[in-house]
Amino acid sequence: MSFSPQEALHRTIEHGEIFFDEMVDLMRQIMRGDVSPMMTAAILTGLRVKKETVDEIAAAATVMREFARPVPVADTSNLVDIVGTGGDGSHTFNISTCAMFVAAAAGARVAKHGNRSVSSKSGSADALEALGAVIELQPDQVAAAIDRTGIGFMFAPIHHPSMKVVAPVRREMGVRTIFNILGPLTNPASAPSVLMGVFHPDLVGIQARVLRELGTERAMVVWGRDNMDEISLGAGTLVGELRDGKVREYEIHPEDFGIAMSASRNLRVDGPEQSIQMLRAVLDNEPGPALDIVALNAGAALYVAGVASDIGDGLARARAAIANGSARQRLQQYVETTRALVA
């Protein structure tokens, strides 16, 4: 007998936990469109108010992965996702998108999962499109891009078509729900390592433990104390690191890596064009906080991907990839490859 939406709603109202198998059953019903929009909204609200547990999030992510269109990557060694939940309200340029090119040029392979802007001035899809890349690639084309360039961008609407069932509900609700934290957990290429930024400090430990439940090998979940879903230059950054099946929580600071502190306002942009200008300046090795934050985040990605021995080593590799022009070349190679794949 399936777990009824009514029971789920009652459980959340009473601040009770929905167990893993129950949540799997419930999410399948929601993703199939078997639960009414009104009931779906009520359940999502109940989960948000009581705060989602590790098991609830892991179960929901498991079902989203079931319903996704997977990317057939034959070799996932050194494959990493650099992703953020968004919603931090910082309106910075596309740091993780820029870090993707740097990390790939420095030896990692990146399978980035993203979408258009929801809360920021420029989402990863918006930035890549402005750079001239084709973002609406099919799963086999993304796999080919990874094989040829070490980079693949998975545009969420193509890989998660079943999300259209809940899209109207989410849009009408207009508040964060569990779906805001599921996207970064549902990489269609099954990247074994992840650098994930989150919008709230409570999610640092939670998301790291969810990733462990989902079988991720290595991960860093980060939240900057200046409310950035990146490793920040403006304050300390809380880290939940998953390694060898254990989650360790700690804090890092830019000074730990010889980087001067800089307020996030120095990285803010008004839209995709300004974001692209800043991204290109970084890849042209223009000194400043934009280059520093990209190199630091790319360095962390290289660490979790197993390319670097620690973040400091990753930072050095990232800076070298920017300075020698290979990161800029990787951007151009990626843009040309995506165009060729659809020609």
From Swiss-Prot:
Q: Which GO terms describe its molecular function?
A: anthranilate phosphoribosyltransferase activity; magnesium ion binding
Which residues make up the binding site for anthranilate 2? Answer: R170
What is one term from the GO cellular component aspect held by the record?
A: cytosol
Keywords (A to Z) from UniProt:
Amino-acid biosynthesis, Aromatic amino acid biosynthesis, Glycosyltransferase, Magnesium, Metal-binding, Transferase, Tryptophan biosynthesis
Which parts of the sequence bind anthranilate 1? G84, N115
Q: Where do the annotations place Mg(2+) 1 binding?
A: S96, E230
Q: In which pathway does it act?
A: Amino-acid biosynthesis; L-tryptophan biosynthesis; L-tryptophan from chorismate: step 2/5
- According to its UniProt record, the EC number is 2.4.2.18
Q: Which SUPFAM superfamilies match?
A: Nucleoside phosphorylase/phosphoribosyltransferase catalytic domain, Nucleoside phosphorylase/phosphoribosyltransferase N-terminal domain
Q: Where does 5-phospho-alpha-D-ribose 1-diphosphate bind?
A: 84, 87-88, 92, 94-97, 112-120, 124
- Return one Gene Ontology term, BP aspect: L-tryptophan biosynthetic process
Annotated cofactor note: Binds 2 magnesium ions per monomer.
* A Pfam short name: Glycos_trans_3N
Q: What is the required cofactor set for this protein?
A: Mg(2+)
HAMAP family in the record:
TrpD
State the name under which the record lists this protein. Answer: Anthranilate phosphoribosyltransferase
Q: Which organism is it from?
A: Stenotrophomonas maltophilia (strain K279a)
Phylogenetic classification of the source organism = Bacteria, Pseudomonadati, Pseudomonadota, Gammaproteobacteria, Lysobacterales
Gene coding for it: trpD
